[in-house]
């Protein structure tokens, strides 16, 4: 987040004609610009586009050097995600290469209104998208909180201390990180998979994990007895997810296929 962006926001707001009217005297363009910086992601699509570019960069870095890996932390509630990322940023000084991972088994066990369930796609199909939205709501709140504190420090600082605080504002790193979201086996045919993927992307997901099992017979990927779909059917679901990403303008999409127990593969 750069100073020039803040200045640009102030200049843009100053061009709003209402600021010249007496009824707007109490509204300060600088404060409105601060609020815009505290809420730089206006929608889940904005988040998906931002995080997808991060993930693509990280995958390219890993392909070039396997020691440049990422870490994905399981998370089942927005507050947990918020505290994780605040702690990570405080400990490491950055959120770089730190992701959140929404596994289907975790959603089934901890987020279903039916109560704890096994990893068999029996939970509500919209629960993953709902959790994605919740996580990013809390992470955006973390941004607003930290920047709000810096703005208050800036207002109270002496002239000699202001440049240091301004530099912290200019170099602020968001708590928004990529989410890998599990769509199980798509919760139906390719059209159902497309609709579900679209909802997840609209909530902010930049990466979707999908399995080639029959949706109604879905089991945990670590268990035996899985019933898989024909190759053509699975490709149709993969393409359905790709179309969902492309329709929403998220071009740096990422898809992961569970090809065997404990192994993830990019597709």
Language-model segments: residues:
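Active-site beta->alpha loop and helix N-cap motifs at the rims of alpha/beta catalytic domains
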Residues: 116-235, 247
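Metal-dependent phosphodiesterase/phospholipase catalytic core, i.e.
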Residues: 230-238, 252-255
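N-terminal capping/small domains of soluble enzymes
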Residues: 2-159, 165-175
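A cross-family glycoside hydrolase active-site/sugar-binding cleft signature
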Residues: 72-76, 103, 180-184, 209-211, ...
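Conserved catalytic or regulatory cores that recognize and/or transform ribose-phosphate-containing ligands
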Residues: 12, 20, 24-28, 32-33, ...
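Single conserved hydrophobic/aromatic residue that forms the stacking wall/gate
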Residues: 256-267
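Active-site-proximal loop/turn and secondary-structure-junction residues that shape catalytic pockets
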Residues: 74-80, 106, 185-187, 214-216, ...
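Short amphipathic alpha-helices and their capping/turn segments at secondary-structure boundaries
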Residues: 81-95, 193-202, 237-249
């Amino acid at each position: 987040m750069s100073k020039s962006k803040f200045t640009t926001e102030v200049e843009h707001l100053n061009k709003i004609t209402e600021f010249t009217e007496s009824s707007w005297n109490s509204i300060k363009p600088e404060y409105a610009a601060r609020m815009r910086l505290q809420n730089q992601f206006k929608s889940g699509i904005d988040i998906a586009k931002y995080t997808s570019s991060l993930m693509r960069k990280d995958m390219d870095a890993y392909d070039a050097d396997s020691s440049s890996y990422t870490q994905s932390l399981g998370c089942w509630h927005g507050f947990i995600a918020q505290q994780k990322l605040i702690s990570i940023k405080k400990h490491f000084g950055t959120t770089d290469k730190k992701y959140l991972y929404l596994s289907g088994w975790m959603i089934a066990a901890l987020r279903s209104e039916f109560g704890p369930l096994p990893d068999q796609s029996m939970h509500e199909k919209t629960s993953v998208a709902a959790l994605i939205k919740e996580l990013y709501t809390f992470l955006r709140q973390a941004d607003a909180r930290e920047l709000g504190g810096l703005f208050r420090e800036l207002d109270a600082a002496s002239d000699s201390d202001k440049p240091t605080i301004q530099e912290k504002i200019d170099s602020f790193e968001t708590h928004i990180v990529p989410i890998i979201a599990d769509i199980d086996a798509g919760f139906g045919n390719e059209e159902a998979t497309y609709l579900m993927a679209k909802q997840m992307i609209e909530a902010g997901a930049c990466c979707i994990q999908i399995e080639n099992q029959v949706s109604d017979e879905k089991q945990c990927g670590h268990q035996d007895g899985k019933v898989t779909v024909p190759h053509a059917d699975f490709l149709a679901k993969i393409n359905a997810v790709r179309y969902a990403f492309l329709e929403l303008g998220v071009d740096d999409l990422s898809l992961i296929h569970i090809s065997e127990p404990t192994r993830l593969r990019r597709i």
